[in-house]
Swiss-Prot record:
Propeptide: 23-40
Organism annotation: Amolops jingdongensis
Protein's recorded name: Palustrin-2AJ2
Cystine pairings recorded for this chain: 65-71
InterPro entries on file: Antimicrobial_frog_2, Frog_antimicrobial_propeptide
Primary residence: secreted
GO MF terms held by the record: antioxidant activity
Tissue specificity as recorded in UniProt: Expressed by the skin glands.
Listed GO CC annotations: extracellular region
Entry annotated with the keyword Secreted: yes
Length: 71
């Protein structure tokens, strides 16, 4: 029985180490996904702001044209 304890402990240790490494790698992958998602959201908001700004400028130009009467 004693001769089987050491190999079993070594296998248990190696399994624990490999499991720990897998969890760290998975956590690193999860962090990268959040960063990419945040960048996509930021890119969408910047695009929406730019479109709103362009629409506002166009409307102001048309309003100014109607008020002054000369275009």
């Amino acid at each position: 029985m004693f001769t089987l304890k050491k190999p079993l402990l070594v296998l248990l240790f190696l399994g624990t180490v490999s499991l720990s490494l897998c969890e760290q790698e998975r956590a690193a992958d999860d962090d990268e996904g959040e960063v990419i998602e945040e960048e996509v959201k930021r890119g969408f908001m910047d695009t929406a702001k730019q479109v709103a700004k362009n629409v506002a400028v166009t409307l102001i130009d048309k309003l100014r044209c109607k008020v002054t009467g000369g275009c």
